[in-house]
Amino acid sequence: MSNEFDYLFKLLLIGDSSVGKSCFLLRFADDSYVDSYISTIGVDFKIRTVEVEGKTVKLQIWDTAGQERFRTITSSYYRGAHGIIIVYDITDMESFNNVKQWLDEIDRYANDSVRKLLVGNKCDLAENRAVDTSVAQAYAQEVGIPFLETSAKESINVEEAFLAMSAAIKKSKAGSQAALERKPSNVVQMKGRPIQQEQQKSSRCCST
């Protein structure tokens, strides 16, 4: 791949607006937090390199706007993504209810092999919780994706979320490569008669 990194993974952050996607990314990429972070217009991305199981992984993380009017812009960015993190706000039930719509978009636009992770952000606001952890866990199990609760403000599980996603993608790629190496080559065995015999047979058929 490169002397600087072993893998390059494209990740997407999706979810409703105001669930904290930009702050979530800012915490991971720059280890900083801003209360008055300006809402993303369209898309933005940051890059960070991490170590995963002895390999250097370069992450290109796209922060997509959650507003409905931007979905036509962001749909093209699903293609080529290795991993997608779906973010909701634990204090906003509607953002959790809309997770299904975001998963439907992934099914529509992303590759079948894309890895997914469900993240309940703003877990530091437990007193305002609207989505029980057990409810989110049950839903994640139902749809077959991992789940974490995070806080960009308090830096809770943010690093873990991206590292878990990176490890899952790396494992998936390694499995695909191993399966490819085990797959027998598609060699077609063809049986035929010597050309001389075919020519002799052909000449007899044409003789009158």
UniProtKB/Swiss-Prot annotation:
It is found in: Cell membrane. It holds the Pfam family Ras. Transmembrane segments: none annotated. A lipid is attached at C205, C206 (S-geranylgeranyl cysteine). Residues 196-208 have a biased composition (Polar residues). A motif (Effector region) lies at residues 37-45. Keywords: Cell membrane, GTP-binding, Lipoprotein, Membrane, Nucleotide-binding, Prenylation, Protein transport, Transport. Low levels in coleoptiles. Gene3D superfamilies: P-loop containing nucleotide triphosphate hydrolases. The keyword Nucleotide-binding applies. GO terms for molecular function: GTP binding; GTPase activity. Belongs to the small GTPase superfamily. Rab family. Protein transport. Probably involved in vesicular traffic. This is GTP-binding protein YPTM1. The gene is YPTM1.
